[in-house]
């Protein structure tokens, strides 16, 4: 048997169970390789770690370069796309201002102010005096409390609404009808 162990090559060991020379790479993954294979296994582990480190550093470097290139490319494309839009905005902006000035000059002669469309908008407002002057309807539900827009404002809105409704003659007649019905 010793003669057979001596006949195995440098990267092989003699397996006494099989009575044959077996490559050391098969036993390097185990915790305890044979004594004749320890030098081979230590060298192969070191080489594989060096290879793994080289691959990791290469992938890290490539991903860093690619991400930097994509960032620069996006920045340049945004800059190029925004320049024509600025030129168009300057051209259309001066045209709109000219139209607005012409419309304002025309409207100064009349009673109404007509603003150019797209520049501003107006909202019609109804004041309390306008609502009181208008003919009140008994069946309308505008005397109910309005929804509060902010937290904690419910009491304020309800109080103002009740005060407003008490001042309307139609609301007073509606509440008198409700009182007379409930008194029966």
Curated annotation (Swiss-Prot):
GO terms for cellular component: endomembrane system; membrane; plasma membrane. The keyword Cytoplasm does not apply. TNFR-Cys repeats lie at residues 7-41. The record marks 3-4 as: Breakpoint for translocation to form IL2/TNFRSF17 oncogene. The chain crosses the membrane at residues 55-77. The keyword Disulfide bond applies. It is found in: Cell membrane; Endomembrane system. Pfam families: BCMA-Tall_bind. One of its GO terms (molecular function) is signaling receptor activity. Its main location: membrane. It is a single-pass type III membrane protein. Residues 1-54 are extracellular. GO terms for biological process: adaptive immune response; lymphocyte homeostasis; signal transduction; tumor necrosis factor-mediated signaling pathway. Disulfide bonds join 8-21, 24-37, 28-41. Expressed in mature B-cells, but not in T-cells or monocytes. Residues 78-184 are cytoplasmic. Keywords: Adaptive immunity, Cell membrane, Chromosomal rearrangement, Disulfide bond, Immunity, Membrane, Proto-oncogene, Receptor, Signal-anchor, Transmembrane, Transmembrane helix. It is linked to A chromosomal aberration involving TNFRSF17 is found in a form of T-cell acute lymphoblastic leukemia (T-ALL). Translocation t(4;16)(q26;p13) with IL2. Receptor for TNFSF13B/BLyS/BAFF and TNFSF13/APRIL. Promotes B-cell survival and plays a role in the regulation of humoral immunity. Activates NF-kappa-B and JNK. Associates with TRAF1, TRAF2, TRAF3, TRAF5 and TRAF6. This is Tumor necrosis factor receptor superfamily member 17. It comes from Homo sapiens. The lineage of its organism: Eukaryota, Metazoa, Chordata, Craniata, Vertebrata.
């Amino acid at each position: 048997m010793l003669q057979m162990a001596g006949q195995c090559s440098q990267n092989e060991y003699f397996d006494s169970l099989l009575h044959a020379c077996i490559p050391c790479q098969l036993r390097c993954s185990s915790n305890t390789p044979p004594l004749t294979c320890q030098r081979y296994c230590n060298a192969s582990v070191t080489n594989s770690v060096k290879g793994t480190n080289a691959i990791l550093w290469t992938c890290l470097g490539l991903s860093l370069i690619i991400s930097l290139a994509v960032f620069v490319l996006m920045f340049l494309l945004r800059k190029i796309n925004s320049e024509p839009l600025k030129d168009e905005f300057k051209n259309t902006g001066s045209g709109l201002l000219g139209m607005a000035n012409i419309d304002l000059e025309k409207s100064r002669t009349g009673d109404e102010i007509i603003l150019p469309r797209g520049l501003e908008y107006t909202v019609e407002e109804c004041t309390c005096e306008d609502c009181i002057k208008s003919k009140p309807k008994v069946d309308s539900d505008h005397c109910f409390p309005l929804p509060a827009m902010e937290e904690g404002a419910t009491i304020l809105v309800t109080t103002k609404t009740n005060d407003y409704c008490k001042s309307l003659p139609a609301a007073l007649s509606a509440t008198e009808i409700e009182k007379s019905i409930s008194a029966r």
